[in-house]
Amino acid sequence: MLIRFRSKNGTHRVSCQENDLFGTVIEKLVGNLDPNADVDTFTVCEKPGQGIHAVSELADRTVMDLGLKHGDMLILNYSDKPANEKDGVNVEIGSVGIDSKGIRQHRYGPLRIKELAVDEELEKEDGLIPRQKSKLCKHGDRGMCEYCSPLPPWDKEYHEKNKIKHISFHSYLKKLNENANKKENGSSYISPLSEPDFRINKRCHNGHEPWPRGICSKCQPSAITLQQQEFRMVDHVEFQKSEIINEFIQAWRYTGMQRFGYMYGSYSKYDNTPLGIKAVVEAIYEPPQHDEQDGLTMDVEQVKNEMLQIDRQAQEMGLSRIGLIFTDLSDAGAGDGSVFCKRHKDSFFLSSLEVIMAARHQTRHPNVSKYSEQGFFSSKFVTCVISGNLEGEIDISSYQVSTEAEALVTADMISGSTFPSMAYINDTTDERYVPEIFYMKSNEYGITVKENAKPAFPVDYLLVTLTHGFPNTDTETNSKFVSSTGFPWSNRQAMGQSQDYQELKKYLFNVASSGDFNLLHEKISNFHLLLYINSLQILSPDEWKLLIESAVKNEWEESLLKLVSSAGWQTLVMILQESG
């Protein structure tokens, strides 16, 4: 698709995809503008003087998320750099390719794009692992030697000792950055991260026609060797309340059918791993679906449109879509609540189809990174499955898939197979070129050998395992929502639960009429209630904002006072009073 930009330099067209970050689109545009344009002052709007947004605020959102369509025109405004900066001191985009793999050497450091707050916070930390003075130390209490000096956050022995399977993303990033950008390199800079791309280059102009009529060593992808990814983008999944999971599982308990949902929350520091990140789950939203005993079906277009609306409303609450969760449960028939253990080391953990689903979701939710030459790297989107463990208990398992898995799926190189633990390698066609694919394994003699992956290979090579849990009961949780149950969840009509005025009256009316503001705050601080009230279109935009502030903010008293005095809220209470 093409997006048009009108500026004082004229009109420019930028080619992009729906899932491209807006920051990436702007990077492509900058090369066509005046070199003196100050990127930090970029603003865009649809009409002159209306709805002006700073580009830095939109950089980490996708083209689709912004609602942009093919041919849309945006007005770009910016200021020129001061005279003392026109020599190029602050230019961020210019880069030069230095080898055939596409590693780019920048003169002035990382890209200037907005990252997540947790990434900005962890970037400032060194992550060093402290060590106590040992018997080998020969110095005093104030001294330090090689036996007690802090370890780097990627230290292998520390992770093995503490049974941490993968190093954190920021530990991995610092390790790469330390090797790629040493002080002796002077002002030159090499992006330590680069997204793998296994697609054939159909725009190669190296003296031949494009694929499938021609091919050369520059446009065809190299042979791929799969291996376990050493890092993970997210280290831990934390569910703020156990009620969230219990209510989600209730759907299976009532119907015996499986259930799927999207998790909403945020990302924050995880202290149990050096420079770790945890995904904090505040709520689960279940899109429209038809549940079955061994799976479920969904209308993809219907779910896509509905989730775009939910994403916007969740964003107003300070939440984003951070993962997906689904059940795979079968009652063991013992009458004690036990379930079958289907997923284990001798069967599979995630099936090949589930791995492909996870990879597609991760590519739709890219992780913004100024240290990547593309402006993004992998994803923080997580996948959780609720199934039976070896003891027959209901348990949660959390995963991500590797950057190699994302690239394989994007290049359409793999598909599901009849064996859930194996991914089938697709054949080369006019649309795709599939190179040789290998994976490393230990043979019967314990020697690591390289195996040809065709026609299929174990999907475990694409998995990254995460830990999960709940906040410590000893410490106060900072959950955004006081209540997770009481008001029906969306799209549960098949279970005999529906969101309507009767349910809303049963849940809210008596409290709304009582004058007890503390209890009213507890009631409205419910993710599903907020979404339903918004769908009624009774409250004005300002009143909706007051409702959100009353529900999710720590200092909610003033906002709630204004809300209950508003015309929209009083209209809602009156409708509930008159409803049957």
Swiss-Prot record:
GO molecular function: K48-linked polyubiquitin modification-dependent protein binding; ubiquitin binding; ubiquitin protein ligase binding
InterPro entries in the cross-refs: MPN (IPR037518), Npl4 (IPR016563), NPL4_C (IPR007717), NPL4_Zn-bd_put (IPR007716), Ubiquitin-like_domsf (IPR029071)
Keywords: Cytoplasm, Endoplasmic reticulum, Membrane, mRNA transport, Nucleus, Protein transport, Translocation, Transport
UniProt superkingdom: Eukaryota
Domain MPN: 237-377
Presence of the UniProt keyword Transport in the record: yes
Biological processes, Gene Ontology terms: cytoplasm protein quality control by the ubiquitin-proteasome system; DNA replication termination; endosome to plasma membrane protein transport; ERAD pathway; mitochondria-associated ubiquitin-dependent protein catabolic process; mitotic spindle disassembly; mRNA transport; nonfunctional rRNA decay
Cited Gene3D superfamilies: Phosphatidylinositol 3-kinase Catalytic Subunit, Chain A, domain 1
Stretch forming the signal peptide: none
GO cellular component: a single term: nuclear membrane
Record membrane topology: Peripheral membrane protein
Compartment(s) where it occurs, according to its Swiss-Prot or TrEMBL record: Cytoplasm, Perinuclear region; Endoplasmic reticulum membrane; Nucleus membrane
Further information: Present with 1050 molecules/cell in log phase SD medium.
Summary of the function given for this chain in its UniProt record: Substrate-recruiting cofactor of the CDC48-NPL4-UFD1 segregase. Assists CDC48 in the dislocation of misfolded, polyubiquitinated ERAD substrates that are subsequently delivered to the proteasome for degradation. Involved in the import of nuclear-targeted proteins into the nucleus and the export of poly(A) RNA out of the nucleus. Required for the proteasome-dependent processing/activation of MGA2 and SPT23 transcription factors leading to the subsequent expression of OLE1. Regulates ubiquitin-mediated mitochondria protein degradation.
Subunit structure, as described in the record: Component of the heterotrimeric CDC48-NPL4-UFD1 ATPase complex. The CDC48-NPL4-UFD1 ATPase complex interacts with the HRD1 ubiquitin ligase complex composed of the E3 ligase HRD1, its cofactors HRD3, USA1 and DER1, substrate recruiting factor YOS9 and CDC48-binding protein UBX2. Interaction between the complexes is mediated by interaction between CDC48-NPL4-UFD1 complex member CDC48 and HRD1 complex member UBX2. Forms a complex composed of CDC48, NPL4, UFD1, DOA1, SHP1 and deubiquitinase OTU1. Interacts with CDC48, UFD1 and VMS1.
Family classification: Belongs to the NPL4 family.
Protein name in the entry: Nuclear protein localization protein 4
Organism this protein belongs to: Saccharomyces cerevisiae (strain ATCC 204508 / S288c) (Baker's yeast)
